[in-house]
Amino acid sequence: MADIIIKNAYVLTMDPDAGDIKKGTVVIEDGKITEIGVKTKESADTVIDAKGSVVMPGLVNTHTHAAMTLFRGYADDLQLAEWLEKHIWPAEAQLTAEDVYRGSLLACLEMIRSGTTSFADMYFFMDETAKAVEASGLRASLSHGLIELWNEEKGENDLKEGKRFVRAWQGAAKGRIKTMYGPHAPNTCSDEFLAKVKEAARQDGAGLHIHVLETEAELLAMKERYGKCSVHMLDDIGFFGPDVLAAHCVWLSDGDIEVLREKGVNVSHNPISNMKLASGTAPVYKMLERGVNVSLGTDGCASNNNLDLFEEMKTAALLHKLSTCNPTALPARQVLQMATVNGAKALGTETGMLKTGMKADMIIVDMKKPHLTPCFDVPSHLVYSAGGSDVRTTIVDGKILMQDYRVMVLDEQKVIEEAQKAAEELVARVNS
């Protein structure tokens, strides 16, 4: 007997070999997809009738800072330097481990509700984020942020903590947690330190999560310091490879794109954050054309201000149609691929498609809504019309985290109240 059967659904497999099934069935057993088709002879403990809904792979958020939910709306519409120096950094200096747990748990709740089943996170007090992931049932790739600032002692301490975290949590939560090394950025870490981090990651078989060329200021600073941009500096020290997740990649030259392609670097595109902070427009259309694996991220709530990947998909599609003056750029199905298949590839997880033998990470989207009627093209509706609030059911590793809009794994009201309290107390400490 199977664990879960989802029937009567429009099955958006994202598997190019299988295509979509207009009235299909998905069978789940022991955390994996065991059957996909029109009908099944199997019976199950739980049968979900998904008539009028789409079942699709869960969305993958490849760059965020979960605990920054506590900074949602805290400081907006400011110049970057003022935003960081007068608001975000002073607030982060007051963060406690308990704050990070409460903020991360709130982020997990928000992601469950909006259809994200897996995410990549880089921040501080990462044991607390890992505990939140464990409690929520989500899948995550986590890294402790390493910010050396050309201070050898600080770098050694950060790297020591990064190693401890990687080794302590790798494979935790029944394999749902993967760990990575998280050097913050080339303009906050020296080339010598970045080379050490790369070697540590190689020894531990872990990936690397790093911000790259998010701003023009970084580009100019790197050229002044090294006589070259971030991409070429990282390439020269042997940092790049398929194990690297590079967030933002806004200020890229054509030559930079070629380096990323040659080395198999995975890019996380964060369009809303880049627009809100006026960082610039990443050359995503060019990257995709040249075969770079580009996925989607939200960045932290301080610069987004939510974790809704449906909103991120629509924004990405529209931004690059506008920036290229080409209405055919980033069509709906390609953007869906960025949020599922490409994201799973970037994080090295057996997810992103609905395919027999793959992990059962999926969502059910309710299409019986005024703003989703009529429906001529399902991928188009998912990208241009749907939102995270249309997700009715979320499943990770074969476990139902939310069913028919009811979160099953967390006390929703308690999570919200405790996060609100943590945020208010944090701001009070900052202002005292």
Swiss-Prot record:
Cofactor: Zn(2+)
Entry keyword set: Hydrolase, Metal-binding, Zinc
Other facts noted in the record for this chain: SAH is a product of SAM methyltransferases and is known to be a feedback inhibitor of these enzymes. As a result of this inhibition, organisms have evolved efficient enzymes to metabolize SAH via different pathways. The pathway found in methanogens differs from the canonical pathway, it uses the deamination of S-adenosyl-L-homocysteine to form S-inosyl-L-homocysteine for the regeneration of SAM from S-adenosyl-L-homocysteine. 5'-deoxyadenosine is a radical SAM enzyme reaction product which strongly inhibits radical SAM enzymes.
Phylogenetic placement of the source organism: Archaea, Methanobacteriati, Methanobacteriota, Stenosarchaea group, Methanomicrobia
Pfam families given in the database record: Amidohydro_1 (PF01979)
Protein name per Swiss-Prot or TrEMBL: 5'-deoxyadenosine deaminase
Organism of this sequence: Methanosarcina mazei (strain ATCC BAA-159 / DSM 3647 / Goe1 / Go1 / JCM 11833 / OCM 88)
Gene: dadD
Enzyme class: hydrolase
Domain of life: Archaea
UniProt-annotated binding residues for substrate: 92, 184, 214, 299
GO MF term set: 5'-deoxyadenosine deaminase activity; 5'-methylthioadenosine deaminase activity; adenosine deaminase activity; metal ion binding; S-adenosylhomocysteine deaminase activity
Residues annotated for Zn(2+) binding in this entry: 63, 65, 211, 299
